Amino acid sequence: RVRDLGVTVPLIGFPRGSAALAERYASECDVQAVALDTACPLAVGQRVQAIKPIQGALDPLLLRAGGAALDRRVDQLVEAWGAGPWIFNLGHGILPDVPIAHVEQVLKRIGAQ
């Protein structure tokens, strides 16, 4: 419907909670990239990457928690999706009480990859 209004800018679609249909969504929807939520399996993201770029899917709760578990998940995402096309991002919004140190932790981790 957005295209019917004359919008021509690139769009990232977010089929939240529908990992089972993510490939179909990527194939059939007029978006230029697909945002994936935190429940999306890494293998599904890889299959969607073969169709369109993806964005996501770090868990905001893990960002809040920080520590070694956060590093492990960042590493998993980079290993699975880092060859691209992929935009590193959260799976759904940053929580207001996330310590800035945890955001810095992620940025350093990604920068080291």
Located regions from the model:
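Active-site loop segments of alpha/beta catalytic cores
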Residues: 1-113
